[in-house]
Amino acid sequence: MLLSTYLNWASVLLTIAGAESNIDPWDEVSSFLQGKLRKLDVTNPNAYDMNDNEQDATFYVSMDYHEEEERSEYESVWQYYNENSDQDWHKSVYDKLQVSADQFNNTEAMYKLSQINLWGQYGYPHNKSVAFQYLQKFNDMTSYENSSALFDLAVAYSTGLFGTLPVDVARGLLYFQRSARLGDLKAKQVLAYRYFSGYSVARDVDKALLLYKEIAEEIKKKYSEEQWNMVFPYIESYIVRIPDFDEGLLGKGLSTVPQSVRRKKTTRPPFAGSSNLKPIGDVGYGEVVMQFKFNAGNGNPGSFVISDSEHEDRLVELFYTAWDLYKGTYTRGRDCDKAKRLLLQVYKTYDAEVKYMDNLQKFFYVKSLDLLAHMYFTGEGFERPNVQAALDLFDRSEKILEGAEISRTASEVDKGLISQYYFNNTLGALKHYKKAKESGNAHGILFYQLGKLSEKNPELKIGDPYLYMQEASSQQYLPAQYEFAKMVESNELRKYSVEDITRLYKAFVEENENIMAPHLRLGFSELLGGSSEVSLYAYAQAAEQGYEAAQISAAYLLYQLPYKFDDPPETTIERKTMAISYYTRAFKQGNTDAAVVAGDIYFQMKNYTKALSLYQSAALKFSAQALWNIGYMYEHGLGVEKDFHLAKRFYDQILEHNQKLYFAVKASVMKLQLKSWFMWLNGKELDNISIDQEQESTVVRPFFDRLVQLLKNLSRETRGDNKKKNQHRILKEKKTPSQGIMERFGLQTEDLLTMVCVLIIFAISMFFRTVAPRGQWNVRINGVNIAGGNALGEEGNPENENEEDDENDDEGRARARNNFGFGNNFDVQVFAI
């Protein structure tokens, strides 16, 4: 609020100062900004001079959020601009924009100021409150007729800009509807998602279908016939969940949702090793030429060797470097030009040396040629496609691999496309498609083309076009997704519901993120650059559009669950509530882990009823973590009556879904059983014991949490770092009665007894395992003999066992008498719980 007041006064002063001039400075400012970089995209391959050893996406996400720190950071940026003469233009331009907006009521200046503050454009600091002020003013001045500004305003009200203003979902919906009527595709997508999911509106799948279909038809118009039918453009996808870069929301082994990370740097095969690529000529990035030389001993060209100073598998590294450049990664966008130059250098240098290559080198050389041929065919990296050059390279590859049975699915598909669309040779195309299909690694485009051909040429009896298109759609080939949705919608014989058809259109719309959600890439770029608040706004936009991955990413940026022994994040209740909202919406779209995390947040807030409800919903989706959480709540009576029987039932159900958690489950059940025995011995009732969700209790805080917190506090006191944390802790201790040692560590008597019993059981088990073989005791664990001979005799034959027992009976009895004085065999049976 103080910052907004300051800016308002500054605006008034600037208005007074600019009153002497009657010329609107907008034209001057607009012309000046055209020569400035609006936003640095760190994923752009030309943004930085990265080397080939770049790591995968690495970024820092702060867990805490303080408005004071945001305000201080904003003011420090402006202070830097004021104190550095080379940055004078920032202040000058901003002042002129304010004069244009406030004195001359220039709507373009208002909109520019809103975007500058929303996205941090031109190096200006991000400020949500100032952005909203100018955004609201712009819409007022334009009578709410600008669809893009209305969309931004709708997002602002729907999210409250994360604490900047009160959340008003109904008002946001109104602006989304108005923006959609003005033709904004993103706003239409928001409405379609809300009608489909029932969020903030009554669920209406029919309306959702109409909207998604309308958007899909608009998207199709943006592609040419050649792109749609033959070579669909490559889309660099940024539909990725941020926590998936750190093993998912729940961590390794517990997440039930497949990872969304796809475009990481290609993993090299083990034999390729790691090469330090050297620049050759003007090729630049990671370009290297494997050095061949003649054997100086005999001068025989057939005895060429690789230089000892170079890695023998350098050609493998060359191909993967070109492949990474061609497809791009999350941290480095596509660079087809450099990929082309690298592949051309490979072709120029090695083609004459093919006869000296071994099979491995030939294989990767051919893969390099096929990739270069594909780029000639599509025109990627070139001014225009060159079909003849592509065919020449394909022929060269076939000649090199003559007689070898190697799958070349992609090249066969490309040759089929050339035959089908350039030479109108349907039979020739089918021949290539058949080879590609027989490889067992067919692509979606192959089934798409077979479906189109079978529909166009039924006399050839190629197959069922419906099934081909269905297979292509399942492989997420975008034109096939649209065509299959149209086929399903028009075919009454196929049993597909309206909801199924809507899902098909929804998937097609969302996969075209280059049209519908380019801000996903911007959000990821901002996160890499350290601007987490700008990134949050970008992901929030996509989250409102219904992108499940964006909902998870936005929620993760708003609130992250702490690690086991870390302090809870310090943030505002508005951000925490919005995080829960996004996690819940993601769960309704199939992300089971999101329900568990939302439940954990409610659990930390002592709202055990809502936490239990979310855990139960996730448990129905077979989440092992949710089942364990429910068992824990029944064990401790958190929001429910304490019931050890139900707790054990939920613990046992975990093994039905995840056998890897066997020991963890058995340890929990053992602890539960021992606690039950102890409470029974003390005469305590197990039923009708519950902890109110608003009651502050030390019972539910584990021993190790208390121990670690105590060590942290002692460490802070030793360092003298006790300004904020200890002040808060001291104030709390004044209101809390003094605690005993066991309460201080979060221990109860039955907890201590449980740990002692578990240690005794393990000690007895280790004792028997060590002593039994020496004393020839017959020890069985769950009926399996582990000492004293094979339980079934030799080769599992009971008769051998009986014969051996008869022969050694006297010797065994004598040994037993000598050891312990017993006249019979000493049998010990240990049963694992």
UniProtKB/Swiss-Prot annotation:
Highest taxon listed in the record's lineage: Eukaryota
UniProt entry tagged with the keyword GTP-binding: no
Annotated membrane topology: Single-pass membrane protein
GO MF term list: ubiquitin-protein transferase activity
InterPro entries reported for this sequence: Sel1-like, Sel1_AlgK, TPR-like_helical_dom_sf
Comp. bias (Acidic residues): 796-810
GO CC terms of this entry: Hrd1p ubiquitin ligase ERAD-L complex; Hrd1p ubiquitin ligase ERAD-M complex; luminal surveillance complex
Signal peptide location: 1-19
Bilayer-spanning residue ranges: 752-772
Localization terms from the record: Endoplasmic reticulum membrane
Annotated glycan sites: 105, 127, 146, 424, 607, 688, 713
Keywords: Endoplasmic reticulum, Glycoprotein, Membrane, Repeat, Signal, Transmembrane, Transmembrane helix
Protein's job: Component of the endoplasmic reticulum quality control (ERQC) system involved in ubiquitin-dependent degradation of missfolded endoplasmic reticulum proteins. Component of the HRD1 ubiquitin ligase complex, which is part of the ERAD-L and ERAD-M pathways responsible for the rapid degradation of soluble lumenal and membrane proteins with misfolded lumenal domains (ERAD-L), or ER-membrane proteins with misfolded transmembrane domains (ERAD-M). ERAD-L substrates are ubiquitinated through HRD1 in conjunction with the E2 ubiquitin-conjugating enzymes UBC1 and UBC7-CUE1.
Assembly notes: Interacts with HRD1.
Name of the protein this chain belongs to: ERAD-associated E3 ubiquitin-protein ligase component HRD3
